[in-house]
């Protein structure tokens, strides 16, 4: 058997599927050489080991050549099997750092055999190294592999268009070299998986799911309406108009929500120069810019108010619409005097100046009777009092004086009663409340004999200091005078006894009603 010329640089492993010459008998070659050379069979087998062919399969041809004179390449070392891994070299370790790790057994075998990447010519496959060193972490062929569930892979349509249409995904498992349907006819061609010169990209880690998910995404995108798509893709807008007066009113009808040109349902700002015609502004939400225009002219307001004031019915309606605290007891009219704030909020107070003006006859045309009730004790009243005042310090005395024979107003004039004591703090206000209470009981609501009651603020002491000319005698005697201690004690006891008897009388009257 003659051996062909051996290459000077490296040895290679070929898988040739073309018709091969008939193999010579192995036994003849071994023993024939022994007879010729005079060597034993074991020695002859050792010498002629590299001259054997057809050992094991008809489609295999192994050529072993020695190239000790040249430096061996990184992928030149191989085992006799042909399907094992190469020994690691300096070039292989450098290439393994540059190429990304890929998954093993990610596609079915039939699809891998039919892939156009496996149908390259023999000349192209010789330009690239086939086998590489696989680390212990990469050697996962014998382990159970489970795909990770893709969350949402990015679509590959963008970068696939820029690639060569004949470029396909790399497959890094050398054990996947399987024949296609052409292997059944007997015409075999060398199958090698070349290394792509292009560096690893995102597609190297593709497991085949991206193509299926891309199709589903395209289908879902076609079914999604444009309005919904605009909600996902439109940017978030957050604006506030500089002028709040330009914003539309609360009850203005919004624009149709079906408009695809507007991402946010908002009415466009109006210009103040050209207001739109045919629009009607709600009166409940006036614009602050045109607030002055909506207010009627002052000349137009009295026309309606005067018509109401001209009739008694209109006057009563206007009075009833006002605050009840500003009306007298029967709600027929307002108070005649200007009142001031005092200790008791439920009572109306007048100042000493108003009292002096009444005494001077300033309101004589409006007042029929002006009654002043001095609620101090008799020794205080004798020491100095207001001209025309009546001293009534007992409640029963006030009731007999005012309610037994009530004063009836005539000609539309008023009957006014003013109460006071030394400071108008306790005795005067208490007497005023008592008269109003008894007057309510004796009349049908809201009618009253004395609807207009007042309390002099500051009492006699303040009035004496400001209006001494209206005091008679022009002097002031306090309640706690040292010369009238016994009188003070006597009147207090009498007032308390009467107050106790009053409470008993009220209790008896309630029991009778039961």
From Swiss-Prot:
Pfam family, one: Rhodanese
One of the record's GO cellular component terms: cytoplasm
Gene symbol of the encoding locus: Cdc25a
Positions bearing Phosphoserine: 75, 78, 81, 87, 106, 123, 172, 271, 284, 311, 503, 509
Protein name: M-phase inducer phosphatase 1
Positions of short motif KEN box: 140-142
GO molecular function: phosphoprotein phosphatase activity; protein kinase binding; protein tyrosine phosphatase activity; protein-folding chaperone binding
Free-text note regarding domains: The phosphodegron motif mediates interaction with specific F-box proteins when phosphorylated. Putative phosphorylation sites at Ser-78 and Ser-81 appear to be essential for this interaction.
GO biological process: cell division; G2/M transition of mitotic cell cycle; positive regulation of G2/M transition of mitotic cell cycle; response to radiation
Stretches assigned to the Rhodanese domain: 366-472
Subunit (UniProt): Interacts with CCNB1/cyclin B1. Interacts with YWHAE/14-3-3 epsilon when phosphorylated. Interacts with CUL1 specifically when CUL1 is neddylated and active. Interacts with BTRC/BTRCP1 and FBXW11/BTRCP2. Interactions with CUL1, BTRC and FBXW11 are enhanced upon DNA damage. Interacts with CHEK2; mediates CDC25A phosphorylation and degradation in response to infrared-induced DNA damages. Interacts with HSP90AB1; prevents heat shock-mediated CDC25A degradation and contributes to cell cycle progression.
Modified-residue entries (Phosphothreonine), positions: 497
SUPFAM superfamilies referenced in this protein's UniProt entry, alphabetically: Rhodanese/Cell cycle control phosphatase (SSF52821)
Motif Phosphodegron: chain residues: 73-83
Region (Disordered), start-end ranges: 256-308
Family the UniProt entry places it in: Belongs to the MPI phosphatase family.
Post-translational modification: Phosphorylated by CHEK1 on Ser-75, Ser-123, Ser-172, Ser-271, Ser-284 and Thr-497 during checkpoint mediated cell cycle arrest. Also phosphorylated by CHEK2 on Ser-123, Ser-271, and Ser-284 during checkpoint mediated cell cycle arrest. Phosphorylation on Ser-172 and Thr-497 creates binding sites for YWHAE/14-3-3 epsilon which inhibits CDC25A. Phosphorylation on Ser-75, Ser-123, Ser-172, Ser-271 and Ser-284 may also promote ubiquitin-dependent proteolysis of CDC25A by the SCF complex. Ubiquitinated by the anaphase promoting complex/cyclosome (APC/C) ubiquitin ligase complex that contains FZR1/CDH1 during G1 phase leading to its degradation by the proteasome. Ubiquitinated by a SCF complex containing BTRC and FBXW11 during S phase leading to its degradation by the proteasome. Deubiquitination by USP17L2/DUB3 leads to its stabilization.
Catalytic site positions: 421
Tissues expressed in: Ubiquitously expressed in most developing tissue. High levels in the testis and lower levels in the ovary, particularly in germ cells. Lower levels also in kidney, liver, heart and muscle.
Activity regulation summary: Stimulated by B-type cyclins. Stimulated by PIM1-mediated phosphorylation.
Compositional bias (Basic and acidic residues): 266-277
Catalytic activity, as annotated: O-phospho-L-tyrosyl-[protein] + H2O = L-tyrosyl-[protein] + phosphate
Matches recorded under InterPro entries: MPI_Phosphatase, Rhodanese-like_dom, Rhodanese-like_dom_sf
Membrane as UniProt keyword: no
EC number of the protein: 3.1.3.48
